[in-house]
Amino acid sequence: MDQLEGEEKTYLSCDTVCKATTLNGETDRLYSTEFLNSLPFPGIPNHELKLKVGLPVMLLRNINQSAGLCNGTRMTIIQLGRRFIEAQIITGTHVGEKVYIPRIIMSPTESELPFILKRRQYPISVCFAMTINKSQGQSLNKVGLYLPKQVFTHGQLYVAFSRVTRRDGLRVMVNDEESKEDDVVKNIVYKEIF
């Protein structure tokens, strides 16, 4: 992010505990705002979200599927407003369209905490790279695949390789120290399960 010109803007979330999971209004004394702000959850942006114009980001929630605002959609930030973020879609069927991202309330789907956190934040994360699973369903002009070890499930190589629209748009880096063979990645199929 430091390589992008322009001013960095920090957005802070508003974190609260869902009233339905509290005990007689004791929530404020049990869980401080600082504690709630410190909690990280997968699929939910952190309390402090640092952004810049030109930064690639990924949408973390379905907002408007017909407009291309789906979980996993990648965008480039155009403007950082007080109440919205303007972005341009760079993947999917709505490439080039400008969209406005509002703050929304998100809660983790799985948590071992004795309460449900409600975090009001922009549903995006900085995205210079993505997992194979997150790329599923997208068509991309260029795909760089980094494989530090063997893929962990059948079909992952197929999903990764089939994202790219042209053969010359694919680059693969295999860096598996444990593998005895050079430049080989196994796509193992267990015929016993069929």
Each model region followed by its residue ranges:
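RecA-like helicase/translocase P-loop NTPase motor core
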Residues: 1-194
